Design a protein with these regions (language model features):
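Alpha-helix N-cap and coil->helix boundary residues
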Residues: 5, 21-22, 39
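Short amphipathic alpha-helical interaction segments
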Residues: 34-49
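Short, cationic-aromatic polyanion-contact patches
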Residues: 3-6, 58-80
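Short alpha-helical segments that sit at the start of domains
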Residues: 1-13, 17, 74, 85-89
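A short, conserved structural fragment
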Residues: 48-60
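Short acidic, hydrophobic short linear motifs in intrinsically disordered regions
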Residues: 20-29
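Amphipathic alpha-helical dimerization/coiled-coil segments
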Residues: 76-109
Length: 109
């Protein structure tokens, strides 16, 4: 599963949110990126096609209704899927051991 840099940035917004979000809320959250609404619309549809984002309902937005979205997988699940695609299955136990060792040597936050 490959996400573009922009798609990853959109997903970071969703992973950090504690609620489903409409496109307009995503647009207002990324004011520094200066994405156009149409670009975000395309990215949201692409993220749904890739299975990392799902439509969960509708919310009133002005005189119309807007779809709301939430992650279809957690950030950790996404990273696991990316690693699983890149790493041969026989090396996964070694990766898990390295992660456990890293956790043991990293101070808790």
């Amino acid at each position: 599963m490959h996400l573009t840099k922009s798609e990853q940035q959109i997903m970071e917004i969703f992973w950090q949110a504690d609620h489903a979000m409409a496109q307009t809320e995503v647009v207002s959250t990324c004011v520094e990126r200066k994405w156009k609404e149409r670009s975000i619309f395309s990215m949201l549809n692409s993220l749904m096609e890739k299975g990392v984002l799902r439509e969960v309902g509708f919310v009133r937005s002005g005189k119309t209704y807007a779809r709301t979205f939430e992650p279809a997988m957690s950030h950790a699940e996404y990273l696991a899927a990316v690693v699983a695609e890149q790493l041969p299955a026989k090396q996964l136990p070694e990766l898990l051991a390295a992660l456990m060792q890293k956790m043991e040597t990293t101070p808790a936050i």
